[in-house]
Design a protein with these regions (language model features):
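Structural microenvironment flanking redox-active thiols in thiol-disulfide oxidoreductases
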Residues: 47-86, 97-104, 139, 154, ...
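Compositionally biased, proline/threonine/alanine/serine-rich low-complexity intrinsically disordered stretches
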Residues: 1-7, 146-165
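Short gly/ser/thr-rich secondary-structure transition/capping motifs
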Residues: 15-21, 48, 93-96
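Loop/turn elements at helix/coil->beta-strand transitions in domains of secreted/extracellular proteins
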Residues: 31-34, 62-65, 90-91
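Conserved hydrophobic packing residues within short motifs/helices of P-loop NTPase cores
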Residues: 34-36, 67-69, 114
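Thiol/disulfide oxidoreductase modules built on the thioredoxin-like
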Residues: 84-90, 96-146
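Short active-site neighborhood of thiol/selenol oxidoreductases, capturing the structured segment around
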Residues: 25-47
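N-terminal "domain-start" segment that seeds a small globular fold
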Residues: 1-26
Length: 165
């Protein structure tokens, strides 16, 4: 589910915890594009796409900030060692064990990802795993970031599995 056209994505001030167990809010990243990925350790498609997300973060560099948000009930204590054991270190990490942020953003299945423009508007949403580090996906993300800069509200439907709002 995506926010109505032209609206900021909800819940920018909902509090979650970061990898250092400090309070973290999405709006603290305002001014930078953010790729937000909701995932869980018990979700096989989520786990399968983690290395590709980590590689995509390396390829995109400073163009976009990757934020992985675990919805595991065990929170940081469960998800952080899981990520570290797999060598996933590049993205920012957030922990939403009560699923407050995921509910407010309309997450209905895992994995779910949102691309937020620098002004915190949702550019698109994906439900399901993706080949994040593939050349076509990296090119699509960069194109969407260009569109978001050029127009405050780009709008088109690209396919059935993701919307550009």
């Amino acid at each position: 589910m995506t926010p109505p056209e032209g609206k900021a994505a909800p819940s920018m001030s909902t509090v979650i915890r970061d990898e250092n167990d400090k309070v973290f809010r999405l709006d603290s990243l305002q001014g930078r594009p953010v790729l937000v990925n909701f995932w869980a350790t018990w979700c096989p498609p989520c786990v399968a796409e983690l290395p590709a997300l980590d590689n995509a973060a390396k390829q995109l560099g400073d163009d976009v900030t990757l934020l992985l948000i675990s919805v595991d009930r065990g929170g940081r204590q469960k998800a952080l060692p899981f990520l570290q054991d797999r060598g996933i270190t590049r993205p920012l990490m957030g922990f939403d064990p009560k699923a407050a942020l995921s509910r407010e953003m309309g997450v209905r299945g895992l994995p779910t990802s949102f691309l937020l423009s620098a002004d915190q508007r949702q550019s698109w949403a994906y439900v399901g795993p993706r080949e994040w580090d593939s050349a076509p996906m990296i090119a699509e993300i960069r194109n969407l970031l260009r569109l978001a800069k050029a127009s405050p509200v780009p709008s088109r439907q690209n396919s059935q599995d993701h919307l550009l709002v």
